[in-house]
From Swiss-Prot:
InterPro entries linked: MFS, MFS_dom, MFS_Na/Anion_cotransporter, MFS_trans_sf
Family: Belongs to the major facilitator superfamily. Sodium/anion cotransporter family.
GO cellular component terms listed in the entry, alphabetical order: basolateral plasma membrane; cytoplasmic vesicle; cytosol; glutamatergic synapse; lysosomal membrane; plasma membrane; synaptic vesicle membrane
Disruption phenotype: Mutant mice have smaller size, develop severe tremor and uncoordinated gait associated with marked central nervous system hypomyelination, and die prematurely during the third postnatal week.
Listed result of changing residue 39 to C: Completely abolishes L-aspartate and L-glutamate transporter activity. Retains appreciable H(+)-coupled sialic acid transporter activity
Main subcellular location of this protein, as a coarse class: membrane
Lineage: Eukaryota, Metazoa, Chordata, Craniata, Vertebrata
Motif annotated as Dileucine internalization motif, chain positions: 22-23
Lumenal side: 63-109, 158, 222-227, 300-328, 387-391, 445-457
Chain positions covered by the region annotation Disordered: 1-25
Gene assigned in the entry: Slc17a5
Subcellular location: Basolateral cell membrane; Cytoplasmic vesicle, Secretory vesicle, Synaptic vesicle membrane; Lysosome membrane
Name the record gives this protein: Sialin
């Protein structure tokens, strides 16, 4: 039997509605079929879009190794001798046709970090624009712009470091609008009892993009040269943009091929949750404690996420001393686990709500706790098992995999508390959550001057502590119902 959607709730206050599951006495509407539906087509295309997005984001970190003259970085070699080198280096035919640049470690840091300085700027504007004109064009142009800029990366590198830094910042500007725009679109497309499934499918593309692009970029660098890394992913992004603009619509009402039944199902499920206000209630938004609960959780989660995303290959190489081929595969493995976990958790979260009558806030709290405390435990464990290579890789993989639970927790709570302003809210939380990407790796580098296991234990413990704090704060102050300021009639509504 297909899942049922609860109908409109009464005008209970927010406190009571926060813990109320599906109402047995409420009018229920049968869910539209999943197969060949417009909403799941949107989720799949969004999945492909975020796959491309993260491939465009992380490909430079791999290509940079091949772009830099190895003689420039010999003095920066900080490989630890605490752990034995457990495998002989593998000699692979290497194509040397790509140009080399004499960039020291500091210059490379600026090149890699410049992305976030653009990324942080367009978060809130992206959410606001998407709430006004729709997310389809904004998200499409964001990925298209990033793809085009990526094609010019080899030229920018030839023109100099400053040009390349500016180009990467421009790519960040383009990518900065994408997540808020996607959230804004789902506010019109995702029925409340399918939010976890639909959003985790779409955003899981980011994890798989990381999994595929890391080793693929390395293969391209070895057997062709680094310039083709940017050409390949740039062209794929342009092809995706054409499909996106052709197939997708901003709302069910404007979709050309959606069935009448599916359109009615989506519209009726959201009719009591969306606001008709023309003015954004900025004051109420910024004073909302449930929003700040998401901000703290998002910031805390991203601290460990970005620390591992940027430094895991370094830890694998300099502490565990894996060779470059093993490093590429093992660094991607945790993100495959996270991708799989996100997909399964989206299904599980909505199943708990529909079949077991779990309230929205209960589901969000449970999945946030598992997705933040679990990774913290295994991250600390990875730092304290020394040179046990198998356990180190296993613990780091489990840590990142468990982070996938959070995708059905705080990550989509914006749509629970204010669906009409979900893009703006995500822009706000992602602005704060980008700060760890700018500062976390720098702090981690400063804490590991001698590159010892004890120093890395400190890095992992700090990340774990921040994760646990964020999980506790979210559990205490998060809400699961639409807030009164997010409704035009200012009456809270059960979600």
């Amino acid at each position: 039997m297909r899942p049922l959607l609860r109908g409109p709730a009464g005008n209970d206050d927010e406190e009571s509605s926060d813990s109320t599951p599906l109402l047995p006495g409420a009018r229920q509407t049968e869910a539209a079929p999943v197969c060949c539906s417009a909403r799941y087509n949107l989720a799949i295309l969004a999945f492909c879009g975020f796959f491309v997005l993260y491939a465009l984001r992380v490909n430079l970190s791999v290509a940079l190794v091949d772009m830099v003259d190895s003689n420039t970085t010999l003095t920066d070699n900080r490989t630890s001798k605490e752990c034995a080198e457990h495998s002989a280096p593998i000699k692979v035919h290497h194509n040397h046709t790509g140009k080399k640049y004499k960039w020291d470690a500091e210059t490379q840091g600026w090149i890699l970090g410049s992305f976030f300085y653009g990324y942080i700027v367009t978060q809130i504007p992206g959410g606001y624009i998407a709430s006004r004109v729709g997310g389809k064009l904004l998200l499409g142009l964001g990925i298209l712009g990033t793809s085009v800029f990526t094609l010019f990366t080899p030229l920018a590198a030839d023109l100099g470091v400053v040009t390349l830094v500016v180009l990467r910042a421009l790519e960040g500007l383009g990518e900065g609008v994408t997540f808020p725009a996607m959230h804004a679109m789902w506010s019109s497309w995702a029925p409340p009892l399918e939010r976890s499934k639909l959003l985790t499918i779409s955003y899981a593309g980011a994890q798989l993009g990381t999994v595929i692009s890391l080793p693929l970029s390395g293969i391209i660098c070895y057997y062709m040269n680094w310039t083709y890394v940017f050409y390949l992913f740039g062209i794929v992004g342009i092809v995706w943009f054409i499909l996106w603009m052709w197939i997708v619509s901003d709302t069910p009402e404007t979709h050309k091929t959606i069935s009448h039944y599916e359109k009615e199902y989506i519209v009726s499920s959201l009719k009591n949750q969306l606001s008709s206000q023309k003015v954004v209630p900025w004051g109420s938004i910024l004073k909302s404690l449930p929003l700040w609960a998401i901000v703290v959780a998002h910031f805390s989660y991203n601290w460990s996420f970005y620390t591992l995303l940027t430094l895991l290959p370094t830890y694998m190489k300099e502490i565990l001393r894996f060779n470059v081929q093993e490093n590429g595969f093992l660094s991607a493995l945790p993100y495959f686990g996270c991708w799989l976990c996100m997909i399964l958790c989206g299904q599980a979260a909505d199943y708990l709500r529909v079949k077991w009558n779990f309230s929205t806030i209960s589901v969000r709290r449970i999945f946030s706790l598992v997705g933040m405390v679990g990774p913290a435990v295994f991250l600390v464990a990875a730092g304290f098992i020394g040179c046990d290579y198998s356990l180190a890789v296993a613990f780091l993989t489990i840590s990142t995999t468990l982070g996938g639970f959070a995708s059905s927790g705080f990550s989509i709570n914006h749509l629970d508390i204010a669906p009409s302003y979900a893009g703006i809210l995500l822009g706000i939380t992602n602005t704060f959550a980008t700060i760890p990407g700018m500062t976390g790796p720098i702090i981690a580098k400063s804490l590991t001057p001698d590159n010892t296991i004890r120093e890395w234990q400190t890095v992992f413990c700090i990340a774990a502590a921040i994760n646990v704090f964020g999980a506790i704060f979210f559990t205490l102050f998060a809400k699961g119902e639409v807030q009164s300021w997010a409704l035009s009639d200012h009456h809270g509504h059960r979600n």
